[in-house]
C-alpha cells in the first residue's frame, strides 16, 4: 500500500478547499410583495451585506407598483448598509422621456450603477421600439452611469442565432456598458466557450457569471426551460429522489455552486453574481466556504 507524502497530501487538500485567489461577489434580490416577504428580504440583505459584496442589484417589474418597490428597496439598501445598490431598469414599458426622468432621479439620489435591460415582451406585442443597447445609450446621455447588461452563454430564447445574440451584446458594450452579467447556467463549459467567443468578437468588458444556488430543483428546471438553459444529466441525477428532502437538496445545490465557482476561478474568473431569490442561507454558506467572509 502506498501513501501520499505529507506535502503532496496537503497540496491536494488545499486544491480541493480553495478557489484560485481572492474572488468578488455580488447579489441579486427582487422587490417583496408581502410584509412577510419584506422581512425575509431585509434579513437576507442584512446577512449578506456583512460579506462586503461589490454591489447588490434589485430587479424591476413591468408595472408601476413593482417599479416603486424597486426604488424603495434600492433606497433602503443604500441607507441601511451603504452598499452600492444597482437597480434594474427596463425600457420595454416606458417612453424615452420617462426613462430619462427615472435615470436623473437615480443620479440625483446618488445611484451610479444601473442594470440596463430590454425587459420581457408582453404577450402578443410586436417589435419593441427600444432595445437594451438603446437604453444604455440613453443612460450615458443622461449621466456617466456605471452600466451592467445581460449576457446569455446558451443564447437568448428570442435570438435568431448564437451569432446574432453575440452581436447584440457587442452593441450594448459599444453603447457604453461596463460589464455583462450572464444568465444562470449549470454547464461550466458553456460559459467558458461563450467567454472565448466574446473575446473573438471584440467584446472587451468583464463577463460575470451568474450563479443560481438550487434548493428547489423542479423550480430551477422551470426557470431553465423558460430561459433556454440546459440542465446537465448529471445534475438531474444528483437531485433524483429528493423531492421531499429539502435539507439534502440545499446541500446538493450548494456543493454544485461551490464546484462551479472553484472551476471558474481556476479559469481566471474573479467576480461572481449570485441569484439569491431573496434567501441568504445558501449564498452565505457558499461564500463562506469559498473564503468570502465578514471582515475579510
UniProtKB/Swiss-Prot annotation:
UniProt keyword DNA-binding present: no
UniProt-annotated binding residues for NADH: 59, 183
Broad EC category: oxidoreductase
The organism's place on the tree of life at top rank: Bacteria
Family matches, as CDD domains: MTHFR
Short name of any one Pfam family annotated for the protein: MTHFR
EC number: 1.5.1.54
Entry function: Catalyzes the NADH-dependent reduction of 5,10-methylenetetrahydrofolate to 5-methyltetrahydrofolate. Is required to provide the methyl group necessary for methionine synthetase to convert homocysteine to methionine; the methyl group is given by 5-methyltetrahydrofolate.
Protein name: 5,10-methylenetetrahydrofolate reductase
Native species: Salmonella typhimurium (strain LT2 / SGSC1412 / ATCC 700720)
Lineage: Bacteria, Pseudomonadati, Pseudomonadota, Gammaproteobacteria, Enterobacterales
